[in-house]
């Protein structure tokens, strides 16, 4: 919904209203996207947004904060771009600290389609990969592939190229997926 309005308050309130309207129907959930700093479509796989903490909070994150706090969407989709040199899907500060700890988000965090394990090699910045994406707080890969699975298994075995994953970290993410399935099925 980053395209609803350039005004963060207006975008947040409109998105919150839409989210409440959809989610009032049993078994329906809304995914808010693209979290965050996705302000362009051209070259979006290759962009790195350099944003101060104040501008991030006052301008770019405010609309997301409003919809999370006011409407409790079932899911958030990360964006392709990097934020200050880190893929948004690999940013624990963004996904765990801000989204979950500060705003109280309890839903599912998912990647945009084919963010991890991308086969493109012509990008300025390396593609996001599965293990760091899980460690940062993503539960669902869209669509996920064999490269992702192998990266996760290597990280669990302590042989990950970038990070190591513990069984408890993976179980935490899996529990969030199960909670979402039950929430939507039980509605």
Q: Where do the language-model regions lie?
A:
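Glycoside hydrolase catalytic-domain context in secreted enzymes
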Residues: 1-187
């Amino acid at each position: 919904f980053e395209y609803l309005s350039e005004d963060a308050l207006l975008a947040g309130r409109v998105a919150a209203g839409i989210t409440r309207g959809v989610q009032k129907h049993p078994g329906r959930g809304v995914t808010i996207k693209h979290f965050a700093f996705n302000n362009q479509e051209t070259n979006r796989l290759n962009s790195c947004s350099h944003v101060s903490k104040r501008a991030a909070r006052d301008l770019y994150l405010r609309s997301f904060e409003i919809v999370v706090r006011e409407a409790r969407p079932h899911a958030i989709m990360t964006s392709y771009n990097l934020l200050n040199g880190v893929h948004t899907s690999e940013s624990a500060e963004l996904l765990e600290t801000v989204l979950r700890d500060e705003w109280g988000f309890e839903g599912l965090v998912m990647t945009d389609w084919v963010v991890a394990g991308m086969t493109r090699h012509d990008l300025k910045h390396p593609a996001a990969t599965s293990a760091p994406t899980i460690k940062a707080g993503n539960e669902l890969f869209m669509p996920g592939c064999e490269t992702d699975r192998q990266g996760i298994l290597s990280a669990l075995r302590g042989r990950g190229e970038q990070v190591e994953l513990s069984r408890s970290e993976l179980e935490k993410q899996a529990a969030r997926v199960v909670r979402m399935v039950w929430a939507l099925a039980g509605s």
